[in-house]
Amino acid sequence: MALYAIGDLHLSLGTDKPMDIFGGAWLGYMDKLRKGLSSITSEDTTILLGDLTWSLDLDGAEADFAFLNAIPGRKIILKGNHDYWWTTATKFYKFCELKGFTDMFILNNNAYEYEDYAICGTRGWFFEEDAAEGSHNDKIFKRELIRLETSLQQAGDKPKLCFLHYPPRYRGYECPEINQSFFFIKIQN
């Protein structure tokens, strides 16, 4: 049972916004994705770290979720900052049931088991040091901290594997508020 994580897929199978237009490493990215995802088995778990589709709603994202549904095994989904399709977990699960999509689960204020570990996480938010108290970004950031703490609490005493869309450490910057909420552990095979 392997554990995989991938984010920022920005699928556009149902919209006209392919990432190939950015050139470079993005050229042929769907073929690269298919090749990379082909090693996943039905026994594995894949964490989808947000920004899954460019679609603005679930119906428009049907082709993208069909692609994700075809990935074998369990898929655990976090929200990204470009996941405009995201409404509620209830609506997502109804959509999946209607379309026959299986083994896709939302990680939001909850936790999932993976072997002897608990999978926790949330979108997070990029912390801006110069954001004014009470600003839009400040409110989102504080809400994401609450979601992260809720997810960690839902895990109980199990060792935690924590995933975020926004990294708490990035190019020399560390987000102390998020780093205080959890600890990093190293998994050795």
What are these model-predicted stretches?
Residues 76, 168-189:
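Conserved beta-sheet core of the metallophosphoesterase superfamily
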Residues 9-16, 87-177:
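Conserved catalytic scaffold of divalent metal-dependent phosphoesterases
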Residues 66-72, 155, 179-187:
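Short, conserved loop/helix-junction motifs that constitute active-site signature segments
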Residues 44-46, 75, 160-164:
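Generic beta-sheet signal
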Residues 74-82:
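Short internal beta-strands
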Residues 8, 50-51, 80-81, 165, ...:
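Active-site glycine-centered loops adjacent to acidic/histidine catalytic or metal-binding residues
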Residues 1-70, 84, 143-158:
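N-terminal active-site segment of His-dependent metallophosphoesterases
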Residues 3, 44, 75, 104-105, ...:
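Short, conserved active-site loop motifs that form the nucleotide-linked donor/cofactor pocket
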